[in-house]
Structures are given as C-alpha cells and as structure tokens.
A protein has these predicted regions:
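Structural motif corresponding to alpha-helix initiation and N-cap regions
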Residues: 17, 37-40, 59-60, 90-93, ...
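Glycine-rich phosphate-binding active-site loops on the catalytic face of alpha/beta enzymes
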Residues: 35-42, 75-87, 122-148
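Catalytic cores of alpha/beta
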Residues: 14-29, 43, 58-70, 102-103, ...
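Expand to "…catalyze enediolate/carbanion chemistry for C-C bond making/breaking, isomerization
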Residues: 142-143, 154-156
C-alpha cells in the first residue's frame, strides 16, 4: 500500500486541505486554504514559489485578493446545495461567472455538484469541478467518475 501511495504521489499532484504545516512537512505539491485559514501571501512565504496554492472564494473581492496574494487557483462554491458541508451557503452562478471573467487563474467549482446538475455550470468559465459525494456516495465509483469526467470535459 505504501508503494502504491508513493507512486501515486509521484504521478499525480498531492494537495493538502487546510494544513500548511503538514503540506510543508511532507513536501506536498501544495495546499488549499479557506477564507478563515492563512492568507495566500503568508502560505506562499512558508511554502515557496514552487508549491501550488489554492484558495476558497465566495465573492469577486475574495477571488481578486487571493489572486493578488499569489493563489494559483480558486475553489468557488458551494455552487449547489450540498450535504457534505451543511453550513455552506450557495454562491450564485452569476457570481461564479463574474469571478471567472475577473481573474486570470483557474477556477474550480465545488459544492453539491452531481452528474445531473454539472451542465448547469456550462458557460460559466470554470476550469474544472471538485466533488465528493458525486463519486464516493455512488455504488460504482469508477463508473460514476468516468461519467462525471465525460460531462465536465464536454463543458470546459
């Protein structure tokens, strides 16, 4: 299992969520931080220029500030109601689209995305999606992943 994990981390980028210290300790490829976590500017100072920094944003102002402070990509959401983060408020699709037009870094939509609703994000300008339940809550994870990937590839 350790060998498989090591090979996967060499082949694929490994981003730690919300834990800059851990990302630094294990030399992860990067870290994703939320608005209540450390500022992107401070994360960049700790991890260096070669690491990937993602920042959650719900508003155009947050997105622009994250980009200015060195974020490499944005996670914007929740774009739909989600059971994974019950306290998450939905980001209007018009705000998502505006964020996509205002920043020059990739925007990843997150929150409540399923194979059934992902096409509603078409034309928003997103570069990808992040999901949990759309894959892991399914009986056949491999098939669910392939179907969702196909839907996303058709739109972005």
């Amino acid at each position: 299992l350790r060998l498989v994990g090591s090979e996967m981390c060499i082949r694929d980028r490994f981003i730690i969520n919300d834990n800059v210290k851990l990302a630094k300790e294990i030399d992860a490829d990067g870290v994703h931080v939320g608005q209540s976590d450390m500022e992107a500017l401070d994360v960049r100072a700790q991890l260096g220029e070669d690491k990937i920094i993602g920042v959650s944003a719900r508003t155009v102002e947050q997105a622009l500030l994250a980009e200015k402070h060195g974020a490499d990509y944005l996670g914007v959401g929740a774009v739909f109601q989600t059971g994974t983060k019950t306290d998450a408020r939905e980001v209007e699709h018009s705000v998502l689209k505006e964020i996509c037009t205002k920043v020059d870094i990739p925007v990843v939509a997150i929150g409540g995305i399923t194979q059934d609703n992902v096409k509603e994000l078409s034309g928003s300008g997103i570069n990808g999606v992040a999901v949990i339940s759309a894959i892991f809550a399914q009986k056949d994870i491999e098939t669910a992943t392939a179907k969702l990937k196909s839907c996303v590839e058709q739109m972005v």
